[in-house]
């Protein structure tokens, strides 16, 4: 009996040591990654502030998922609190918030590269969705943000908690999207607006963060287990859908059989897209 208890105690000790070691490594990897800096030298943007540009920027803000995290007014909010994983907060993007002293190119670096003015990476910003955003679209979005009514709203701090760091250790959590991106300087010119595969691919970049880079679906990274999965969007799953079915899904939030799509999928934002953007 004494040998058995000694064996159990030893096993528990090894397990505890292993857990402590894993969390220690997770903490070290996270802190080292947060301390890394990136250089962004994309060609300077030309930001226009005419009525048409501001309207286009507002359209992008409303249809590219920005409002889901930052709010319709851009003043930021608590997105979710996932207990031991993280407290995800989207910052205030109005002139009264985080962007008030930033240049257009610094804002562009945050949007397309996930990089702060000091070169450090942004946490959990879905930059992969915006990395290929064209220069004119990016400039229009920035013009709109800079023209928003200033708000003093402070949604509080973002917190990276132990389980997020542990998942990040094993590359199971997209904590710092900047790590996965190519930061080589280049201009970005999107394909012409129209009902083409090239333009559809350009618009669909905004779906990567939830549905995955290959659009095959996944549990949305970082969200609590109770949140629904993002479904498979490839022909293997949606091969029977017609164009009208896609329009109904994105405009009405309904599947071909009439059942409702979970509101976690932000179809209300996509409903504001133009016919060309959906087609």
Feature locations, PLM:
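N-terminal type II signal-anchor transmembrane helix
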Residues: 2-37
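C-terminal capping alpha-helices of c-type cytochrome domains
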Residues: 18, 23, 104-110, 116, ...
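The canonical Cys-X-X-Cys-His
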Residues: 57, 63-72, 107, 141, ...
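Electrostatic cytochrome c docking/interface patches
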Residues: 37-62, 101, 172-204
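Extended surface/linker regions that mediate inter-domain or inter-protein docking
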Residues: 13-27, 133-197
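Gly/Gly-Pro-rich "capping" loops immediately C-terminal to redox-active cysteine motifs
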Residues: 40-48, 73-106, 121-134, 162-171, ...
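C-type cytochrome heme-c attachment and multiheme electron-transfer modules
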Residues: 170-194, 201, 238, 249, ...
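Detector for the c-type heme attachment site
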Residues: 69-75, 112-113, 126, 146-147, ...
């Amino acid at each position: 009996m004494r040998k058995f208890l000694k064996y159990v105690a030893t096993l528990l000790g090894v397990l505890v040591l292993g857990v402590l070691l894993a969390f220690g490594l997770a903490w070290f990897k996270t802190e080292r990654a947060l301390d890394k800096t990136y250089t962004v030298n994309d060609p300077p943007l030309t930001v226009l502030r005419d009525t048409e540009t501001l309207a286009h920027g507002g359209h992008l803000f409303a249809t590219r998922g920005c409002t889901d995290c930052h709010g319709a007014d851009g003043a930021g909010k608590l997105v979710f609190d996932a207990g031991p994983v993280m407290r995800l907060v989207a910052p205030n993007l109005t002139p009264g918030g985080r962007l008030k002293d930033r240049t257009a190119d610094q804002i562009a670096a945050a949007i397309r590269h996930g990089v702060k003015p000091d070169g450090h990476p942004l946490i959990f910003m879905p930059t992969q969705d915006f990395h290929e955003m064209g220069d004119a679209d990016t400039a229009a979005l920035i013009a709109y943000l800079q023209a928003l009514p200033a708000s003093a709203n402070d949604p509080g701090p973002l917190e990276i908690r132990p389980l997020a760091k542990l998942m990040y250790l094993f590359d199971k959590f997209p904590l710092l999207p900047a790590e996965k991106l190519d930061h080589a300087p280049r201009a970005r010119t999107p394909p012409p607006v129209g009902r083409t595969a090239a333009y559809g691919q350009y618009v669909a970049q905004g779906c990567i963060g939830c549905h995955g880079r290959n659009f095959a679906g996944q549990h949305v990274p970082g969200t609590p287990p109770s949140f629904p999965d993002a479904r498979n969007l490839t022909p293997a799953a949606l091969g029977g859908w017609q164009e009208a079915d896609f329009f109904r899904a994105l405009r009405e939030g309904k599947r071909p059989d009439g059942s409702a799509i979970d509101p976690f999928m932000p179809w209300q934002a996509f409903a504001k897209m133009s016919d060309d953007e959906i087609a």
